[in-house]
Structures are given as structure tokens and as C-alpha cells.
């Protein structure tokens, strides 16, 4: 039977999904975000995953989380203190409870709170029974058991059925916050199109979570957060991550400049998504080159710039150190080159999945000799699109390498982005040198590769192979 529930209206909510790396927290958060975006809320996300390579299950280092802040008004950050924590095991609870304010809601998967699992993270007694959670609104839910029960008729092994518990949790939260569900069900059918049994099981688990919220008396209240209609100017919107926005911005810059876009890059977290995305867009004149190392990546990009392409290389802090000599060469050659640094945490190799904004001084001064470089830094995930266009404008106009400093939070975080009209994009067209630009005293016409434009002080950009413009630079 359906239980009558109170519906409370809120202006904003912060939800954090937390569990083991294999519990599907990133997918759960991503789908809840997609539902929230389609509903029309303003939002900001913060994915957070371990720096270790698949830490042991049930341990504190292995906890993965996804935080979403959504509201009926304009918001700028993913927030600090989650109002709701979904903890899939004791490790997730212990790692995140310190961030939840008193009075916050905690949904706990009680099936995972066995003595051994609790001892693994230092719980001598069960936090669900010893009073340590008395200041919170705790909802003990046997997510694993309920999921297995809901999937009994699908002929799945127990382990296969257990994997859908994140979809049960997603269904429950979707009911709690009145999220639209059609998009998630369609996504699951697409994702598992080659495994229709698994697709149907995940949809069933998702619906079971929704129905559990609708029928149980433990959840007496559901919540509504109205669309943020006043936060968005008129236009077409989509949810976008920083790296995706940056990739789209680079493609747009190439099209607006009338130049082929070339990316020379070595895969490195958290910048690799840009390489992956750009490799899908050959139809827009994009060429990607996965190099054997950081130096080869920027070397290829600099060669492409010399050849008349809009050239880009992507990396993170350790890679910037390796690329510094070639950046200095680009300065002396006066060639346009975009160096995208998606900053991560720590010195040396650092922590690939953690974030930091500590590369500014390296970007400003990390080269020998006098080699100044302009720096552009986006402020939000959506702003990465405009930052890419601005970096390209500076590089092309003034014939200089430009550093674009993003970071792991911006790269993986997301927010609504208004898709711009083509008329709103800047004109980045460049004029290549096509003939002599100086006349000697004896009347001979010659090409001077470092003759300055009186307005921009940039040198002419002569593409190799142009008759009569043979020259040496550097």
C-alpha cells in the first residue's frame, strides 16, 4: 500500500553518495545529476575517488564519493557540508561522517555492517547501535537484501544482483527529491543494450528503490527543490564537465580561426578526458596524436603550430615540468601554442585523482631564461569553454604560447552550460604571411620573419612551403 508522506520545499540540498570504488558511486551520482539537470535546477558536482589503484574493499583508502549541490537559485560551488549522506558500508560512513552537520540525514546500507567490516575501519562497536549517530536522522536500509529480493525473478547470481544496489539507492533518492526517472531508465537500457537481462535488472532495482521510498514508513518526508528558472538566461542548456567544456572550446576555437586543430598529448590524469573527447571529432578537422611521453607530445604540437595549425598539448603538473624546455622554445620562436595544465595534488608525480591549485608559480616562472607566458584560468566547469577560446585568441593574436590552468575539481565537476549561438563566438581568423614584407635600400623585396605588426607586435606567421618565404626562426 502507499503511505502518505509530507512534502517539504527546500531552496537547496547537498547530497553525497559514498561507498567502495566498486559500488558504482560515480555512476549513481552522475545519473542523479543528469536527472537534476533535466529538472531545471542549478547544480554543481564534486566527484572524489581514491588515488590508490583499487584499494582493498571496505577500507578507508578505497572510499569513492560523489557530491551534488542543487538549488532553485544560482549556486557556485559543490558545497562543503552534505545535508544527506548515502553510506554503502562502514568505511564510507567513517570517512564522511565528519562532514555531515548535526541534524543531517544518513542513509546506511545495514547489510554491510558486519563485525569484520566494522573492525576493518576501527569501529569497536556498531555506530548504528552505540549512540554515536544520535544527533543525526539515520535511515537504516538493507539495500543489498532489498535489491536481491527485487531481482529474484531475473535468474542472476547473487553477486550479479548485488551490483545493482547502487541503482536501488538511486531510485530511493530519486523518490525522496521528486527527480524525473525516464532519463535514467533510458540510459540503463542504452548502456546495457548488449545485455538485456542486466539492463532489465538495473531498471527493476531502480524502480524498486523508488517504490520502497513510496511505501515504507521510515521515510515520512520527501522534498521538492523547484527549478532555478531565474538563474538561467533564455537558451538551450546541457550539463557539462570542465574537461568536456574545454574540449568543445578548443574545437570551437579551431573552427572560428579557420585552422585545423592538433592535439599532441601524453595521457595523464586528470587531463586524459580531453584527448579522449577530441579524438572523436575528426569531422571538425581535429587531429590527435598520443605520444610516447610528455616531451614528444609538446614537440609534435609545436611542429603543428609551425605548420599552421591551432596546436594544443594537455598535461598535469608533472608534465608541465617536462614540457618546460619546449615551452621556452615556443616563446623564442613566437609560435601560438596552448599548454593545458589540469592541476592535481602534490609534488613530483603527485596524487592523480586529488586536486590542488599549486602550479601557478610553475606556469609563470618554470622556464630558464626570460620566457614569459600569458596564463588563463577558468572559474567554473562551464567557464572552461570560454577560457579555451580566450587562450586561443591570445595565442593566435600575439604569436605566443599560452598556459591554461584548470584543476581536477573543475575537470571532473559539472554544472549547467548554455550552448552559445555561433554568432556569439569570437572571430579568431588569422592572416598567414603570403609574400615579402620588407624592401631593402636597393629595392629588393624580402621576407623578415620577425618584423613586427605595429598593433599587436606579433611577428608574421609563415607556413612552410609558401613560395619565397623560406626563413629560419629561433
Describe the predicted segments one by one.
Residues 17, 27, 227-302, 306-314, ...:
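Non-catalytic terminal/interface segments that mediate subunit docking, oligomerization
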Residues 49-50, 188, 205, 226-230, ...:
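A glycine-rich phosphate-binding loop feature that marks nucleotide/adenosyl-phosphate handling sites
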Residues 116-122, 150, 324, 347-353, ...:
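Glycine-rich, charge-decorated loop segments at or immediately adjacent to ligand/cofactor-binding or catalytic sites
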Residues 159-166, 170-178, 382-385, 393-407:
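Conserved anion/nucleotide-ligand pocket segment
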Residues 12-101, 261, 269-365, 374-395:
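Thiamine diphosphate
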Residues 1-257:
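Active-site cofactor/cluster-binding pocket
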Residues 239-249, 257, 387, 392-474:
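Flexible, low-complexity linker and terminal segments
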Residues 117-133, 356-364, 421-438:
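Acidic, Ser/Thr-rich peripheral helices and adjacent loops at domain boundaries
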